[in-house]
Structures are given as structure tokens and as C-alpha cells.
Regions:
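Two-component/phosphorelay signaling modules centered on CheY-like receiver
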Residues: 10-29
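Short acidic active-site motifs
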Residues: 33-37, 59, 100
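Conserved N-terminal glycine/acidic-rich loop preference
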Residues: 34-35, 46, 54, 85-95
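Conserved phosphotransfer microenvironments
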Residues: 50-73, 80-81
Length: 123
């Protein structure tokens, strides 16, 4: 089970992805702007940060920087619509048109396991 923060602006997509993750046993917090990201990071720790495809590129960069600054050790997954990802600093990129619910869930689980292994090793 991973602690996941999903940042985006498309409510339907956020709700769908939250449902997929919660059914698999993950804890999920949704954030729609930087203020909510900072608040969530102060309230708890996250293994995986998901950045939605509907965010403009500059906003994705700000969100990524904020997650890295306020959620130490977080792994970032970027969803994108384009052929080339917007966010070079993400750990993983998923193209929306090529992603199934199962591949999304597998990717989050793999990222969380990397984060958890690193966290345990440093303790």
C-alpha cells in the first residue's frame, strides 16, 4: 500500500484514478493547485506523486518542483498527451492514449516499491 498524491484539474479523471488506486489498497489524496500540494505534504508523507495530463507544462514544472521540495524522496509519474513528455524530471511518463487501468496501477505499485525500499534502507 502506497501513499499517493494526485495533482490535476480534470475532476472526472482525478475521481477515476483515485477509485482505481483505492480499490488496490493505496491511500490517495487529490490536489488541484500548489497550495493544496504544500498543505498535503505538510500533513503527511507520500511515496508517489502523479501529475495529470491536463496541467500546462509550466504548471507541471512548478508542481514537480514543489513535490520534490516538500515531499522528500517522492517518485513522480507524469501523464501526458503528446508524443514527447512535458516533464523531464519525472521518474516515469505515461502517455494517456497508451495507458490502461492495469498498466497505471502496476506503474504506481512499482514506483511505490522503489520509494519504500529506499526509505527502509536509509532508516
Amino acid at each position: 500500500m502506497a501513499n499517493v498524491i494526485h495533482v490535476g484539474i480534470n475532476e472526472a479523471v482525478l475521481a477515476t484514478r483515485k477509485t482505481i488506486l483505492k480499490k488496490a489498497g493505496h491511500n490517495v489524496i487529490l490536489a488541484r493547485d500548489l497550495r493544496e500540494v504544500i498543505s498535503a505534504c505538510k500533513a503527511g508523507s507520500f511515496d508517489v506523486g502523479i501529475i495529470g495530463q491536463a496541467l500546462p507544462q509550466m504548471e507541471k514544472l512548478r508542481v514537480s518542483d514543489t513535490l520534490r521540495k516538500h515531499c522528500t524522496g517522492i517518485r513522480i509519474l507524469e501523464f501526458h498527451d503528446a508524443i514527447k513528455p512535458d516533464l523531464d524530471t519525472a521518474d516515469v511518463h505515461l502517455r494517456v492514449a497508451e495507458t490502461t487501468p492495469a498498466s497505471f496501477l502496476d506503474t504506481v505499485t512499482q514506483l511505490a516499491s522503489i520509494r519504500c525500499k529506499k526509505g527502509r534502507a536509509s532508516q
